[in-house]
């Protein structure tokens, strides 16, 4: 059985939430560099991990060209050092590695969408869809990943036709309005992200995460910092992806 998938649309035509923020670059550049650096550093040091908007504030640093794409990171430099306090000899240079993988382009949105296409789509999205489809005997095809569409998106479609401050995937929306009938259901698509935050509201999942992360004396992560993440999640902060990443690592390490 052959099925069609929509993978590639967000990466090619600017469908992620932070893509809209990148269109605000000219506005952000009005803020003096020293003020942006102070705001970025202060948010990293003083705001608790998982605090809404903390990652975005960290992105307002001196070099918007390289810092904004890093706003989606789960573990910033400060948190990594705290979690790996017993491994101080490690070179924790994830920011440098990611900066080097950002494609060279004068347009910031074009750089970020290319980075997502080369890294996130290839190393994450397509891996999951391929595994889930094959285990169910499906041959999945992604029309957006046709070479002609890829070339068209990156070579001919300007950023303002992909994303603005007020909207995303504008070109695709215009095309669907022209091609699909008025009575066609145009509700937003439903993603397949794991509802981690909802899961962690239940005692069973929270206890399981707690046991995996704090139930062993052999963990490489600082137990006090891990407990802060767990407590922060209970207080409504957004730490579910961080905790899930730590749990998956510990299970793999065992």
Predicted regions and their residues:
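Active-site adenylate/phosphate-handling loop in enzymes that bind or generate adenylated species
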Residues: 1-50, 120, 126-149
């Amino acid at each position: 059985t052959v099925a069609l998938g929509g993978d590639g649309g967000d990466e090619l035509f600017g469908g992620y939430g932070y893509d809209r923020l990148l269109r605000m670059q000219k506005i952000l550049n009005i803020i003096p560099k020293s003020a942006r650096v102070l705001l970025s550093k202060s948010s990293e040091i003083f705001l608790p991990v998982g605090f809404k908007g903390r990652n975005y504030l960290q992105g307002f640093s001196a070099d918007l060209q390289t810092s904004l794409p890093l706003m989606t990171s789960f573990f910033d430099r400060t948190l990594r050092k705290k979690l790996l306090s017993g491994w101080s000899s490690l070179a924790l240079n994830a920011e440098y590695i990611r900066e080097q993988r950002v494609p060279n382009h004068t347009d910031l949105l074009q750089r970020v969408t290319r980075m997502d296409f080369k890294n996130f789509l290839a190393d994450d999205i397509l891996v999951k869809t391929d595994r889930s489809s094959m285990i169910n005997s499906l041959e999945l095809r992604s029309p957006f990943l046709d070479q002609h569409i890829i070339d068209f998106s990156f070579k001919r479609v300007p950023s303002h036709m992909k994303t603005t401050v007020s909207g995303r995937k504008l070109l695709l929306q215009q095309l669907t309005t022209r091609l699909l009938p008025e009575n066609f259901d145009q509700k937003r698509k439903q993603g397949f992200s794991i509802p981690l935050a909802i899961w962690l509201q239940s005692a069973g999942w929270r206890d399981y995460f707690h046991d995996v992360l704090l139930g062993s004396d052999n963990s490489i992560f600082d137990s006090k910092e891990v407990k802060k993440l767990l407590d922060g999640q209970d207080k409504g902060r957004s730490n579910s992806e961080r905790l899930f990443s730590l749990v998956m690592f510990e299970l793999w390490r065992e």
